[in-house]
Amino acid sequence: MKIFYQSFVNETAAPGYWGRLGSFLNSHAHANTEIVFQGITPFDSYAHALVEWRCGREAIANAITAGRNGFDGYLMGHFQDSGLYEARAASSIPVISLGEASMLYGCQYGQKIGIITINPRFIPGHEHQVRKYGLAERVTAIHAMQFEPGQILAAFDDADLLQQVADEFT
């Protein structure tokens, strides 16, 4: 099986994150499963609707290309799921997303769940996702920390910044 993993960052911009992501996913993949990682350039470093649109547009194109290149599935590794429905409509292979899958998985463990996002500007998009996925009665709260995506990525290579993120989260 060959899976196309679409990240909304790239290896050059976030080597610590990229390395950990690859190690984690490859260690959990079934035998004979190949995961091919693809980033976006420029990566999603600032929380804004236009950045999400731009990255989503590239993700849609990559989903189409993955289907044409013989991949068995496409995994969108971005919680905001930008371009998810369009990628599903346009691609010839199954498209699964981090945000939708995480919310549905969370709902298996609790009647009500919440979302903690990294930046308040993501809240309207997450509210839209929750409604679109039919989970408005189950996702009862969306709270935000105060980080830009680039800061979170940098925390994978900076112990002090990682501690700031952990302190904000708790």
Model-assigned labels for residue ranges:
Residues 10-12, 77-83, 118-122:
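Gly/Ser/Thr-rich loops at beta-strand to alpha-helix junctions
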Residues 48-65, 160-169:
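Glycine-rich, highly charged phosphate/nucleotide-binding loops
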Residues 88-109:
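Short, acidic/small-residue loops that bind anionic groups at enzyme active sites
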Residues 36-58, 150-157:
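N-terminal beta-loop-helix "entrance" segment that forms/cooperates
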Residues 20-33:
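A short, Lys/Arg-enriched amphipathic alpha-helix followed by its capping loop at the start of a domain
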Residues 130-170:
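Active-site rim beta-loop-alpha module in soluble metabolic enzymes
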Residues 1-18, 113-116:
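Short beta-strand segments enriched in small/hydrophobic residues
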Residues 6, 67-78, 170:
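Periplasmic-binding protein-like
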